[in-house]
């Protein structure tokens, strides 16, 4: 039955009076996520205004779409923070298989090619990127597998390791090396945190590095990204153009920045300024002070997220919390590294900043999982299901 309070929470998903009964850490994590989203909306509004005005005649088209995605994502977030993690762990194998099938469909007639890669499926006017939804699925299933490693028979272990490998391979073939690398590193770090034997970790790390090097060596565009990253000014109007314009934007920001809305590079000089290179617009408008402030925010988020995870007495829940922090913070640092020229150009968005429905929804699912971990770290808030829980550590 939908009560007036529930209806109000659906319409205004940031409104939730039940939050007052949560633990302090759960409330703090929710506040940090909302602050991150608020910063992202402000920056995206500025970065997208000129493009929206040029393509639709109004400067609000992109930001209004993003707000719609946030509204949907926040309702999913509110649902997940009330859903016991044991239920999530029971359902995630089915979700993972469905998302994997959707990734396969990107190579079929339903797949949409953008910039030489088939990573999207068209649903009328909406494009979805299945690989984004794989991230929370991998966090949950990896935490369950590696957290209960000794409970799984070898046959089950090999089946799930094979599914993980198939998932990474299917994303790589889109081609999408950056998301493959992020998911691979996320799985590896969750396995490391679970205490798996070093022989497994070292062998999989070597296999991953070999796969990445092979992919770069056989794909011309990936090799061009690496060479342009090493010296973007060698071809400033060709392969190095994106990075050169991004560096110009960051340098133009100086110490205090040009001011909100005053970026010059977003005026059709910097490509994909609303997605992969949105941090460059942020740096140009808010300067070194703004960049340091945002990095400090990421540091605070990482500290609190790790504290929430480490307080959990259940191994699987602890690994879920660690996995969420790894994916959100790791992706953020990779995006910033690309925009600042510290890493080769990739296609990873900046969570809660970059425009895109799939990325927005995926990030909010991860956020909901971490807040739920924070709620369940207080044993009084755990909802009993009458099922066997993960082993305590």
From Swiss-Prot:
Q: Which residues lie on this side of the membrane: Cytoplasmic?
A: 1-30, 82-84, 141-157, 203-242, 307-318, 372-393
Extracellular side of the membrane: what ranges?
52-60, 106-119, 179-181, 263-285, 340-350
Membrane topology according to the record:
Multi-pass membrane protein
Its cellular-component GO annotations read: cell division site; plasma membrane
Q: Which InterPro entries match?
A: Cell_cycle_FtsW-rel_CS, FtsW/RodA
What subcellular compartments does it reside in?
Cell inner membrane
- Give yes or no: UniProt keyword Cell membrane: yes
Q: What is its main location?
A: membrane
Q: What is this protein called?
A: Probable peptidoglycan glycosyltransferase FtsW
Organism lineage reads as:
Bacteria, Bacillati, Cyanobacteriota, Cyanophyceae, Synechococcales
């Amino acid at each position: 039955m939908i009560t007036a309070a529930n209806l109000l929470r659906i319409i205004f998903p940031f409104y939730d009076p039940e939050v007052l009964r949560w633990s302090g850490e759960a409330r703090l994590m929710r506040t940090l996520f909302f602050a991150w989203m608020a910063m992202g909306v402000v920056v995206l509004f500025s970065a997208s205004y000129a493009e929206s005005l040029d393509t639709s005649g109004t400067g609000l088209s992109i930001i209004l779409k993003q707000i719609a995605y946030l509204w949907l994502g926040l309702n999913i977030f509110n649902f997940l923070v009330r859903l016991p993690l044991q239920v999530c762990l029971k359902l995630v194998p089915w979700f993972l298989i469905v998302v994997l099938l959707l990734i396969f469909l990107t190579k079929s007639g339903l797949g949409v090619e953008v910039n030489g890669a088939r990573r999207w499926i068209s649903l009328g006017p909406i494009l979805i990127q299945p690989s984004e939804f794989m991230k929370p699925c991998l966090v949950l299933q990896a935490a369950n597998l590696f957290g209960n490693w000794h409970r799984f028979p070898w046959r089950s272990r090999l089946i799930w390791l094979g599914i993980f490998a198939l998932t990474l391979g299917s994303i790589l073939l889109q081609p999408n090396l950056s998301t493959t690398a992020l998911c691979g590193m996320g799985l590896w770090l969750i396995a490391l945190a679970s205490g798996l034997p070093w022989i497994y970790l070292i062998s999989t790390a070597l296999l991953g590095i070999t796969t990445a090097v092979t992919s770069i060596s056989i794909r011309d565009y990936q090799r061009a990204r690496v060479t342009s990253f090493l010296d973007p000014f060698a071809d400033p109007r060709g392969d190095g153009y994106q990075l050169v314009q991004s560096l110009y934007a960051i340098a133009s920001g100086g110490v205090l920045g040009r001011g909100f809305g005053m970026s010059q590079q977003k005026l059709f000089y910097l490509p994909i300024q609303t997605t992969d290179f949105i941090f460059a617009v942020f740096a140009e408008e808010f300067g070194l002070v703004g960049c340091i402030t945002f990095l400090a925010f990421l540091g605070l988020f990482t500290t609190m997220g790790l504290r929430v995870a480490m307080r959990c007495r259940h191994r699987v829940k602890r690994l879920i919390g660690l996995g969420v922090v790894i994916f959100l913070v790791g992706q953020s640092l990779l995006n910033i590294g690309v925009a600042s020229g510290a890493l080769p150009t990739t296609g990873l968005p900046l969570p809660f900043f970059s425009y895109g429905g799939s990325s927005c929804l995926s990030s909010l699912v991860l956020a909901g999982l971490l807040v739920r971990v924070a709620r369940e770290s207080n044993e009084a808030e755990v909802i009993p299901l009458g099922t066997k829980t993960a082993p305590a550590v």
